[in-house]
Design a protein with these regions (language model features):
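Non-catalytic accessory regions of SAM-dependent methyltransferases
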Residues: 1-43, 50, 55-58
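Conserved AdoMet
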Residues: 39-120
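Conserved SAM/SAH cofactor-binding pocket of Class I
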Residues: 108-143, 164, 178-187, 192, ...
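Charged, low-complexity interaction regions
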Residues: 146-165
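Generic L/I/V-rich hydrophobic alpha-helical segments across diverse proteins
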Residues: 149, 172-179
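Cationic, low-complexity basic patches in intrinsically disordered or flexible, solvent-exposed regions
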Residues: 167, 404-406
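S-adenosylmethionine
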Residues: 236-396, 401
Length: 407
């Protein structure tokens, strides 16, 4: 195989083929995908765009940057650390070697926590956001027509032209109002409870292979107040910041023992526009938590890999911070600490939501029960593995629902 040199002419197609072979020789599991992801980052394009640029030649600067990326990946450095970012749900998060790389299965934790507050799925929220935006655009169009009409009539001295303009304005306003009605807005403020969406009456079809969408708990009743969220072991902040984006009436506290991780989470809070609703605390779980702090939701994806297993993990996973992986002899050390203190910091009616390791679901559920919480669901991930445990601090409002779930 020829070496990648800056003197040779390298097209997109040629360099992808070369890198795929090179990565295959290094034992990487997805050599072509890795090559495409790295090249896209260098060129600033999407993967699909590569197929339209196969004959494009790389500049010396692009080739130099790509070559450095390839060498790092060949040494099994995770892709996200090389590019410096990772997609989680619909947002890009900065990541560094100081934080665990966000993973797809963790998105389910966010989805279920959102349902706990809203009673709605992420799909429903996205649909409502779409129509809300359409309604706002329609309202702006109506206002623009009215403003333009007033200005025009004020300057118009010819009565016939004024009448003609009034008719044109009426026609424009009618068109704008029709658009507003289609967006769920007629007059006045939009009624969010009646926002329409495509196929509202259609039965939701669950793709094969996805986990059961049985809800983990009925919606929390916050009586119009702010929803308070605590994320223990926040890392990049992916869980908490996604929740803040999806729940505008919420605020959150991100806790991590690592100051480097908290720095990354703070950057991401600013990038996602939720820095005004996010606070950060360097603490070993509860050690520096104010005694009176109370939350509606406590979420955590703590270290859960048994210490003796870490050396057997994929080489790129071993590049992630040990602090975010090592869960002690049985992988449950962090869960014991979190559950031991959560009763004093979760409001009645509140939710505790955990991501867990393989085979840990029932053990973590038992730890929750020991603290007086009612386990409402152990949810499987996309691979059919028990991956999340949800527990509520019961009160009379939920007692009937909980009994029904336990039958």
């Amino acid at each position: 195989m020829i070496a990648m040199t800056e003197q040779a002419v390298w097209t997109v197609n040629k360099i992808l083929q070369w890198t795929q072979q090179y990565f295959s020789g290094k034992g990487l599991e997805t050599p072509r995908l890795d090559a495409e992801v790295l090249l896209c980052d260098v060129l600033g394009c999407r993967r699909i765009d590569l197929f339209m640029r196969l004959q494009q030649e790389l500049s010396p600067e692009e080739l130099k940057k790509y070559r450095s990326f390839v060498l790092r990946r060949a040494a099994w450095e995770p892709l996200a650390y090389i590019t410096g970012h990772k997609t989680f749900l619909q947002w890009e998060f900065n990541v560094t070697p100081a934080v665990l790389i966000p993973r797809p299965e963790t998105e389910l934790l966010v989805e279920k926590a959102v349902h706990f507050v809203t009673g709605k799925s992420l799909t429903q929220l996205e649909k409502e956001a779409f129509w809300r935006k359409k309604a706002e655009e329609a309202r702006a169009a109506v206002d623009k027509v009215k403003t333009l009409s007033a200005e025009k009539l004020q300057d118009e001295t010819d009565p016939e032209k004024a009448m003609a303009w009034q008719q044109e304005v009426a026609d424009r306003e009618a068109v704008a109002l029709q658009a507003a009605e289609r967006a769920g807005l007629v007059f006045g403020e939009p009624d969010e409870k009646k926002i329409p969406g495509p196929a509202d009456d259609a039965e939701e079809k669950k793709p094969q292979g996805l986990p059961d969408r049985k809800e983990v708990a009925p919606p929390v009743k916050t009586a119009g107040r702010t929803v308070d969220i605590l994320d223990i072991g926040t890392g990049s902040g992916a869980i908490l910041l996604s929740l803040l984006k999806l729940l505008p009436g919420s605020r959150g506290l991100a806790v991590d023992i690592s100051p480097e991780a908290l720095a990354v989470a703070k950057e991401n809070a600013s990038l996602l526009g939720v820095a005004d609703r996010a606070w950060f605390l360097q603490s070993d779980i509860w050690s520096r938590m104010p005694g009176k702090a109370q939350f509606d939701i406590v979420v955590s994806n703590p270290p859960y890999i048994p210490a003796e297993v870490i050396g057997t993990l994929e080489r790129d996973v071993q590049k992630e911070p040990r602090l975010a992986l090592d869960g002690g002899p049985d992988g449950l050390d962090a869960y014991r600490k979190i559950t031991a203190g959560m009763a004093g910091h979760i409001r009645p009616d509140g939710l505790a939501a955990f991501e867990v390791g393989i085979g840990q679901g029932e053990a973590v559920a038992a730890l929750c029960r020991e603290q007086g919480f009612t386990v409402t669901a152990v949810v499987k991930d996309y691979a059919g593995i028990d991956r999340m445990v949800f527990a509520v601090r019961p009160d009379s409002a939920k007692a009937g629902w909980v009994r029904q779930q336990q039958k």
